[in-house]
């Protein structure tokens, strides 16, 4: 495996971290499920012409697999957006999500017999130590948002393993488009059943955050993610996605004043330290 997928994953994690900020601002006025539904449906519509022109249409079986993967993604994101609507500690939430992401290679091992390579077991202790330091000053009290984050994280870990597996056989733009459409449909359905549009309306500035969520944190991010996953192992992807809480913590510190002490800086350093190890292993092993 060359380094291009790993560098793509660095960009994906930056876009994902920005998505935390975009989403937090957007749902300050938009209903969470309505935000997810409209955001992902619009992103799917933007990708549809590209998929139609560049790639052959998927078979019915492939469409069903992609739709199932999209259902997992939709469930995870609806749980996630509910969690961030009730929490100001975005860095801590990103930590919880990343711990479950580390379990994705184990899920792939159980479901698809894709045993993680040696690099995963060697870098796993470093990654866990870094994540623990990143969350060192977090107050881990029992709160509703904590349970939402845990549920979202568990679903996301499974989805990542399934996504990577299907990315080997389904055209990337079609896979991304179908997943985003399913997520959007789930969000829209939940909005119609449980939410109401705010009577006071939505301010103009919120639509700017919404547009950034659609174009940057959804359309571009998930398209790049699918391309990267098609060329790397689940273990590589899971370890690379640990960069997301580092970027999220930095943004949360800059915009929301989340405390950033020496322990968190050390944790960020440990997470970043694994990058040279992954780049080295990328030259030695090709994904299966």
Where does each model-flagged region fall?
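Hydrophobic transmembrane alpha-helices of multi-pass small-molecule transport proteins
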Residues: 47, 68-69, 73, 116-136, ...
């Amino acid at each position: 495996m060359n380094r291009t997928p790993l560098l793509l994953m660095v960009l994906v994690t930056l876009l994902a971290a920005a998505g935390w900020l975009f989403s937090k601002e957007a749902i300050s006025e938009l209903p969470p499920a309505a935000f997810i539904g409209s955001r992902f449906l619009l992103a799917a519509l933007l990708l549809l012409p590209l998929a139609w022109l560049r790639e052959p249409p998927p078979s019915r079986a492939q469409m069903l697999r992609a739709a199932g993967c999209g259902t997992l993604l939709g469930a995870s994101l609806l749980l996630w957006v509910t969690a961030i609507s009730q929490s100001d500690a975005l860095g801590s939430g990103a930590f919880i999500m990343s711990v479950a992401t580390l379990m994705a290679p184990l899920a792939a091992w159980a479901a698809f017999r894709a045993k993680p390579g040696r690099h995963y077991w060697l870098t796993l202790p470093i990654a866990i130590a870094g994540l623990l330091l990143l969350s060192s000053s977090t107050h881990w009290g029992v709160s509703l948002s904590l349970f939402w984050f845990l549920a979202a994280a568990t679903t996301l870990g499974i989805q990542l393993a399934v996504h990577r597996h299907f990315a080997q056989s389904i055209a990337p733009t079609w896979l991304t488009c179908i997943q985003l459409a399913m997520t959007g449909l789930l969000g829209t359905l939940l909005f119609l059943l449980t939410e109401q549009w705010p009577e006071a309306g939505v301010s103009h500035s919120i639509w700017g955050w919404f547009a950034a969520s659609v174009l940057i944190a959804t359309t571009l991010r998930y398209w790049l993610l699918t391309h990267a996953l098609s060329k790397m192992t689940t273990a590589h992807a899971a370890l690379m996605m640990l960069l997301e809480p580092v970027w999220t913590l930095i943004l949360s510190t800059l915009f929301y004043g989340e405390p950033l002490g020496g322990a968190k800086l050390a944790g960020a350093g440990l997470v970043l330290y694994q990058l040279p190890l992954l780049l080295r292993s990328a030259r030695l092993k090709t994904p299966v």
